[in-house]
Amino acid sequence: MALRNLMTKKPFAGILTFRQQLRCVQTFSLPDLSYDYGALEPAISGEIMQLHHQKHHQTYITNYNNALQQLHDAINKGDSPTVAKLQGAIKFNGGGHINHSVFWKNLAPTREGGGEPPKGSLGSAIDTNFGSLEAVIQKMNAEGAALQGSGWVWLGLDKELKRLVIETTANQDPLVIKGPNLVPLLGIDVWEHAYYLQYKNVKPDYLKNIWKVINWKYAAEVYEKECP
């Protein structure tokens, strides 16, 4: 996530308040993809990838940055109602940015290892916690297909219990909403914008085919870092 600082006026000297922690506002920018938009075809079309990345993800970032700036201004003004009102926009758009930033890394072209089963410690953990990789895929597909409305289905690591979990989140809620110790290893976007242009209303087909381009290598790297 690229960051740049927008410097603002310092609050009155000698007053140690939360305002002093907000003398600069961090803003976020659209992350580059490590592959071309068409590189995931036929599992995910280039048209969907371009629209999803350039339009949908960018919109979350733009709205997130705007909400953060408004929050900064409201805190400096002591405008508590506006501070409270902005929490929903920050959660939704910030979550959209967080989730999509993980999602792009969870994908890889087949020629670059997309779809290859996980090995090493993550592969062993999957067998221990779920019995097999196929069981994980079936459970995540079932959870994703059953999710009402928009949301995400996740394979996560519970760092405290040192075990893998499968969870769903609504709208753009990030996985951490389900627990502060949960780390996302793999997230699948089940919003219609992720598949409708190609799969229409047949979400199960999208969920079936996306595994052909899942980047298990990235998931394994996160797992090994968080659960050495």
UniProtKB/Swiss-Prot annotation:
Using the UniProt entry, state which stretch of residues is the transit peptide. 1-24
Family assignment?
Answer: Belongs to the iron/manganese superoxide dismutase family.
Return the EC number.
1.15.1.1
**Residues at which Mn(2+) binds:** 52, 100, 189, 193
The gene from which this protein is expressed is SODA
Question: What function does the entry list?
Answer: Destroys superoxide anion radicals which are normally produced within the cells and which are toxic to biological systems.
* Official protein name in the record: Superoxide dismutase [Mn], mitochondrial
Gene Ontology MF, one: superoxide dismutase activity
Q: Gene3D superfamilies attached here?
A: Fe,Mn superoxide dismutase (SOD) domain (1.10.287.990), Iron/manganese superoxide dismutase, C-terminal domain (3.55.40.20)
Localization in the cell: Mitochondrion matrix
* Organism annotation: Capsicum annuum (Capsicum pepper)
Q: What is its main location?
A: mitochondrion
Q: Which InterPro entries match?
A: Fe/Mn_Superoxide_Dismutase, Mn/Fe_SOD, Mn/Fe_SOD_BS, Mn/Fe_SOD_C, Mn/Fe_SOD_N, Mn/Fe_SOD_N_sf, SOD_C_sf
- Give the quaternary structure: Homotetramer.
